[in-house]
């Protein structure tokens, strides 16, 4: 037997007693008796059994003090004694005595076991005090076993927080105090123990049933020992913060909970096999063990009990996780192993055998301790022969609201695939039809009874009825017939064709027919559209266009006038100067002419009764000037509507009317005296004429006078332009004009005194009268449709131009409605002017063409400029530079035209016409704002 290698570890046991320390210079020598009792150190051994060199050998000579220190810490004799005790220990439990344990520093939690229950406790890694040895207290030496017969103790580091260990020794006597971690074999039952986080010691009972309180000092975590052969595996137990005492019955064996840590292995001669205990998980204090469940689980077997114990330590899973229940019972295992994938995903019909298996599973779940849900009512299923297919429950479709169909839907409805009624019958019956709800009902093809109520609530609905007007299934056509059908189709574009009504499928056809009918209407029947021939016929009179615009509301579908009530304009407050005021309702023949006929006012006046005829008034200066111009014209009308005999009395009548003008003026309405009116009366009179309020009294009186004169002014007489005046000389006409002008002078001056400054001499009045004549001619030009060249007969005088003084508009009196000429007078004037000579127009055109030729010659014949920055006018035109009209006119008038033989001057306006005729870019020197242009 070889000598085992010994390693010495000093482990502090109980707190050392406080002893008085003496500070001496040299250590005291031991007594003589102690030195005699010490045995001699054995001789050194050779071979494998030789002792190894100690960890702290002395390098110098050994002195008495060194020997004393070695003796105080432990001599070789004590090592040999401990080793001999460890190797010669016999596993005899009856001879062992209880080992005295040091008392814990805190209050102990005792646990008592009764009866034959044997208890195995974890032994802390420490050396008990040997009662037979006489040595000083303070340190306990731990011995590590070596070889097969020794005790092997693994050192462990001290944790940060020390824990108290429970130590229960199963040996009867404690004589083997020097043994560390010894476990008594032949343990048949195991008790469940819990360990607190606080360092507490528990009381344990050995086989004899005697319990002795043990003191567990606060020390580091201890190692767990293995049980000997024949004993059951013992699991580790994790310390719980709050310890609870457990009691077990005599016939049960409960697995103890061991703390986590390293395994301490022991080897004995009688137990060569080693059993390693598994680790246990942490037990939550919220799970309280149910004794009834533990009793049921204990009968099932060790495997089930371990599984249920393990499930207590699980963290509760999340709600979205699928829990799979594994039945560990033999009954559940036998029934679960026969289940296949097809049975799990089978049809919705169940048989009675499957219902019984479900009941067995529920009962087995209750017996195995699973959570029992609330009681549910089992539904008996009818066994069917439908093959097992994974059917899906059809959802109830909501009724689609009827909405307007678009053209796209109508066009593509012929090609959409429609479901037939046969497809519904081929589908399997729904799940609700398997239930035997009612005995009466319809029989389907599959042999199921469909109750009436379930039929109404069934999710499967029939096909909707075909909508009215939907396209039928198309027939495949040949290419030729398809082309013909496409040619017959009518495509309508626009916003009105985006939606088609469901109740009228022929909407597109009707709409297209209506459009074609509207396009086929005769343009000549449309009153708003005039044919080219009619436009050419009516181009001579402006009144034709006015009639077509303003009288269109009173015409029927054929363009004829509607017989409506004629409004009498005699007593209206607002004057109508463009119509002859009628004293009474005229005849229908005069008011409703034919469609293409035109009645002259002169003829109507002759045919009217004498009571309704308008008295002939004196001709004004404008009419006299026009007649004078026409009388001096050499050309005579080719076709005169009346002969000389009929015209002579008219001339006499006109001559007499000029003389009788003065007495007839007194017959007009008398103007009221507005000076005598009060201010409120003047305001009311102004409101009658639709004017705003005026604060000044004088302005109100002047305005009322002007309004009265404009309203009560007699209608203008008919022009006598068509009748040439031969018997009347130019002197007589001039005298008449002079007399009429002298008669008009006081009226003009009196009307101007209200607002403008009074005229100083007759020359100014004559110039104003001439300007008025010119303005009236301009009005005639704008109102008639004759070309402007027929009105303007300017004579270019080479001596110079006579500047005509323009009278500003502010000098003229402001009237509420300026006097207008009647339509018939405008027509007569236009006819008279058309008959005027055209000789002057030809002369002007020839003169203008000659001027343009001289302008062209003057520009092109000018020598080219030597300065590139200042080119000539011809070069500017060729370079497309804009030509300033004022500059070019000044250059031409300063000698350029004289060089080419033209004595006169050219105006910028005439020069602009020449530039436009030659397509030359030209512009004015002044811009639109009135200032000179900075750049061109």
Swiss-Prot record:
* Bias (Basic residues) ranges: 99-109, 450-468
| Claim: Glycosyltransferase is one of the keywords in the record | no
Q: Which domain of life is it from?
A: Eukaryota
What GO biological process terms does the UniProt entry carry, in alphabetical order? DNA recombination; DNA repair; DNA replication
Localization terms from the record? Nucleus
User: Which keywords annotate this record?
Assistant: DNA damage, DNA recombination, DNA repair, Nucleus, Phosphoprotein
Where does the record place Basic and acidic residues bias? Answer: 110-121, 145-157, 202-227, 273-284
- Major place of localization? nucleus
- Modification after translation: Phosphorylated in response to DNA damage.
Q: In which residue ranges is the amino acid composition biased (Low complexity)? A: 63-76
Return the annotated region ranges for Disordered: 1-182, 195-291, 303-338, 437-472, 631-671, 734-829
Compositionally biased tracts (Polar residues): 11-26, 631-648, 734-753
**Annotated Gene Ontology cellular component terms:** Slx1-Slx4 complex
* One GO MF term attached to the UniProt entry: 5'-flap endonuclease activity
UniProt cross-references to CDD domains, sorted A to Z: SAP_SLX4
Q: Which family does it belong to?
A: Belongs to the SLX4 family.
Q: Function of this protein? A: Regulatory subunit of the slx1-slx4 structure-specific endonuclease that resolves DNA secondary structures generated during DNA repair and recombination. Has endonuclease activity towards branched DNA substrates, introducing single-strand cuts in duplex DNA close to junctions with ss-DNA.
Q: How does it assemble?
A: Forms a heterodimer with slx1.
Q: What is this protein called?
A: Structure-specific endonuclease subunit slx4
